[in-house]
UniProtKB/Swiss-Prot annotation:
GO terms for biological process: cell differentiation; regulation of transcription by RNA polymerase II. Residues 28-103 bind DNA. The keyword DNA-binding applies. This is Nuclear hormone receptor family member nhr-40. One of its GO terms (cellular component) is nucleus. A zinc finger (NR C4-type) spans 31-51, 67-91. It holds the Pfam family zf-C4. It comes from the Eukaryota. Disruption phenotype: RNAi-mediated knockdown results in arrest due to elongation and morphogenesis defects at the embryonic or larval stages in 30% of offspring. Furthermore, embryos have highly disorganized epithelial cells. RNAi-mediated knockdown in adults results in mis-localized or missing body wall muscle cells. Orphan nuclear receptor. Plays a role in morphogenesis and elongation during embryonic and larval development. Plays a role in muscle formation and motility. InterPro entries: HNF4-like_DBD, NHR-like_dom_sf, Nucl_hrmn_rcpt_lig-bd, Nuclear_hormone_rcpt_NR2, Znf_hrmn_rcpt, Znf_NHR/GATA. Its main location: nucleus. It comes from Caenorhabditis elegans.
Amino acid sequence: MLVPPVSMIMYHELPSIKNKKREKIPEGTLCVVCSDFASGIHYSVASCNGCKTFFRRALVNKQTFTCQFSGDCVVGKSVRCVCRSCRLKKCFDMGMDPKAIQHDRDKIRYTKALKKKREEEKRLKEMVIKEDIGSPQSIASDTYINTSTPSSSTMINILENDHHSYDPEAQNDVKAVIEDLLRLESRVKSLRNSYRFESQVSATSCMYSSCLLDDITYMAENTHENEGTIEPFECSVEKLREWFVRDLSLMLEWGKCLPIMERLLLNDKLALMKAFAPIFPLIQLAFYTRNEFECDIVIKLEPDCTPKPIPERLNYPDGSFIEKGNKPANTWEEMHTMLIDGCYKMMRQLKIKESTFVLYKMLLFHNPDADGLSSLGKKTIENERMRLLTQLFSYLSTERGKEAQTIFSNLLMMSATLSKTASFIKRVFDFNHIFNRTNDLIDQLIIVGL
């Protein structure tokens, strides 16, 4: 008889393990509620951090939920947030024990360190408010935040909700989100670095098909490393277009894997994709560029030897590059300068790690200003973006301490630079479109539309 692998076994199917208290669960065991990977035994059953936190909060806060459908919604890894009523019902059905909740476990004592931090935050708020008087943003609504033109109200709202930094379960939520995003990013990088895959032809058709990043056969065929030495060469407009189409194809596949897509209509999904299309290829290029001076090799020079100036360039995996030059200012050169100085250098000065990058990219994607969003879609995206803003600041506070506020503010301001750079690249492709109409993803998502 064939025995299924451990990763396919649900924990409630392992009675011998279930009865042993504090025993580590087998690697690959699935959450009994949503079938994500379980992080341990929580409230008497094997569950992931997300379901554990959801169950505890629902009971501690005495929340009541109502199903908007027939009361039997599917509770899976990618759709577990759709219906909280059915999710809580399944938690009980699978044996989660409310008596196992320790209600006083996470109470935070008022320590001197906490008092000092709150005083520092209060001082910062007062300082930001003083600076903001008379600015255009001071009359803007605090309930709506636009990451492309961030106001100080963004910072104030996040600081007021910074209790998440002290909540261990909230931190676990953020870490779980980042782990999922890093796994997804790893697949995107593998395809991008091998650049063997065939680019998508139609954005609409792509949104109807299954996600290729989850296709094991497809990934195996298209992620072989390229052999041989890669010689650098200057990127032409045609080569840049080729890489934009590749990155837009990856963006569509990446977007289809995001949990929020399960809650949106097709038109809302396409609206988000179109709004993010000019940004995604630029931020991928800026973050994943590696130049010779970034390696760990130190070259010792003679005392009288002057090192060669380091070219300020951004590289694609095939060796093509764009760089700052001494040519007269034009749209093409201005775009290079803005992307290199405003994004590439900024991320390196701030020492942005990939864990922060994937969360920041998610934040940029959730744009409630996207043209074509339905009223329900707009509201959904607004709520999700506020949640992501809080998670990003919470994560930075944990990882970077006092630097968090500076990094957070700079990332929000960098989104404006990305938007401006995107407008320049649109002009380049707009001009190119007049003489060369190809109806590729650039035409569909950036120039003409679907």
